[in-house]
Amino acid sequence: MNFNIKNNSSHDLSQLTNLVREFYPYAKKHMGFNRDANIFFESDLQNAKNPLGKTAYYNPEDFSVTIYVDGRHPKDIMRSVSHELVHHHQNCDGKLDNIGPTHEGYAQSDTYLREMEEDAYKRGNLVFRDWENQKNIKEIRKMKVTKEELKN
């Protein structure tokens, strides 16, 4: 896999970066995209002050995912990564060809883009949830083995 994660913020995101590195192959397999994306973590303090500010976006021209990280829980950031990777899959499948620039409210005014957003919300959340559950089950099994080893 040839994807990159670049932290352009001043935050220590090593734990988050590790989670994305674990999640990405799972997402690629389950979403089915055939080209790798680049993921950028960005800081925007003005945006973070806005309770309805941007959380992330996908750029189909350079196959990049940009995630705003200020003041956000890692799990929320992971959901954004998953959502934007669905858009990446849509782009790899040619579903974002010739859509033109998006504007505020595009998901409410353009029925096709509304469908793309619905797909990203649904699949993004489900793929992330499935990965999270699988990861948690593995951790529980590891803890059980460790407890049994301690008893012996």
Residues of each region from the PLM?
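Short amphipathic alpha-helical segments
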Residues: M1, E61-V65
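Auxiliary, metal-adjacent structural segments of Zn-dependent hydrolase domains
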Residues: K6-E61
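A structural signal for well-ordered alpha-helical scaffolds and beta->alpha junctions
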Residues: L13-Y24, S82, L113-E117, Y121
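Long, well-structured alpha-helical subdomains associated
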Residues: G124-N152
